[in-house]
Amino acid sequence: MDYKSAGVNVEAGRAFVNRIKASVESTSRPEVIGGIGGFGGFMRLPRGLEKPVLVSGTDGVGTKLELAQDYGSHYGVGIDLVAMCVNDVITSGAEPLFFLDYIATGKLTPEALTEVIEGIAEGCNQSKCSLLGGETAEMPGFYSDGRYDLAGFCVAVVEENKIINGSKIKVGDQIIGIKSNGFHSNGFSLIRKVVKLAGVNEKSCFGSRKVPLIDYLLKPTQLYVHLVQALLQANLPVKGMAHITGGGLPENLPRCLPDGLAASIDRNNWEEPSIYKWLRNEGDIPESDLWNTFNFGIGFCLVVSPDQSKDLIDMCSANGFVAWNIGQVEEQPKQMQSRIVGLPT
């Protein structure tokens, strides 16, 4: 008996590394030192920073991976992995520097995993961060053959005196919601149940344009890094930012607010994506569960002074993003434990 007969093909692993080399190298920033294959990745800090602070974030794609693998869609989840990490770290005003990935699988499937890496590289290129390294672990008996899990890790940098942490937010500030492009990478344990209950297959369509439902569900998570960097480079005084992921607006928006303040949301200020009507009807899901699970059409939020809200919305539009004024900051009602007002709890 040898390692290969036990289920681990070292030669296939080496071939896979060579296969993805071009995709990885396409993401390289000028600060990167050396190439892939070493025990660690090396990168200089960008020039001109006086008091640089590193910001780190890690995340996965969750059970969206199960649906993606069922339908042979691998490229998009690579973008998802980057977006889930990058969208988190940019809420501090930081610039993404590098990304690391971890892939665990029962049996190495080069075609599928190459698509994943190509998606990760695309996400990194959109974010202007380097795919500095990664690990692919073949774990027979732990994962089923052909199934895989993903984890990502991102490091960004920000000047210490430019960190955005919500500390300047005050009563009356406006909350700007940026449109999401779908479910992103949250709530898929519930979505998969509804998909099964509704008998969804490859031919199932959604909406007036008859978009394949699976394509809509698996649409890669929107990256907001280009927009945020454009806003900051224009010196728009953004006071706080929130990436709307698992837990929806009720859980994520308060994370950027100082103690004692709450977000008052007007649900009529943006159009609810029609997919939620389908989800409601097919899954018989309570309204509060929907709001506390999904982004409901808002993928990212920014908090600004009232006199800056129009300029911010206009700049979002100029950069290809739809934005709405969805509410304002208020004092947290003493009798309420929740720090969000106007949404089902």
Swiss-Prot record:
GO annotation, biological process: 'de novo' IMP biosynthetic process; adenine biosynthetic process
Reactions that this protein is recorded to catalyse: 2-formamido-N(1)-(5-O-phospho-beta-D-ribosyl)acetamidine + ATP = 5-amino-1-(5-phospho-beta-D-ribosyl)imidazole + ADP + phosphate + H(+)
Signal peptide: none
Any Gene Ontology CC annotation: cytosol
Pfam families according to UniProt: AIRS, AIRS_C
EC number in record: 6.3.3.1
Keyword Calcium appears in the UniProt entry: no
Family stated for the protein in its record: Belongs to the AIR synthase family.
HAMAP family: AIRS
Annotated protein name in UniProt: Phosphoribosylformylglycinamidine cyclo-ligase
Species: Prochlorococcus marinus (strain SARG / CCMP1375 / SS120)
Record lineage: Bacteria, Bacillati, Cyanobacteriota, Cyanophyceae, Synechococcales
Name of the gene encoding the protein in the UniProt record: purM
